[in-house]
C-alpha cells in the first residue's frame, strides 16, 4: 500500500487522542476538583491540531501544483475526502481513522473541549496522501 506511513500516523494520532480524551472524560464527573487527566488530553489535542495545520497547507499547495503542472483536476473532495482519488483500502483506512476520531470527539467534547480540534489531523493526512499518491482525472481541454 502506498503511503503506509501516512495511514499509520493517522491511526497513531487518533489512538493517542482517544486514550487521553477518554481518560479525561472518565475523570470528569467532579469537574471542580483535581483535573489531572485533562492536561495530557489538552496537550495531545493542541499538539495534533498544531501539527495538522502545516500538513493541510502542504496538501493544498501540492494539490494546486499538481493541477497547475500536470493538468490534473484535483478537487477538494478528492484531496481531503479521497473521493475517486484513492484505492478502497487506503480510503477505508484513512476515512476510518477520521470517523473514529469524530466518534471520540463527540463522546468526549464536554469533558475535553480542545478535542474538537483534533479531527483536522486525520483530515490533513488524507490530504497529504492524496497530494502525494492520489490519482486525479485530467482537466478537460476546451474544444476549438
Residue ranges of predicted features:
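Membrane interfacial helix motifs at helix-loop boundaries and amphipathic/re-entrant anchors
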Residues: 19-47, 74, 105-120
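Hydrophobic, membrane-inserted alpha-helices
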Residues: 96-108, 121-124
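Alpha-helical transmembrane segments and their immediate juxtamembrane interface regions
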Residues: 116-144
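Short membrane-interface loop/juxtamembrane segments of multi-pass integral membrane proteins
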Residues: 73-100
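Canonical alpha-helical transmembrane segments of integral membrane proteins
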Residues: 11-25, 97-103
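Cytosolic-side membrane-entry/anchor segment at the start of a transmembrane helix
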Residues: 1-19, 133-144
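Juxtamembrane loop-transmembrane helix junctions in multi-pass integral membrane proteins
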Residues: 1, 5, 32-43, 85-93, ...
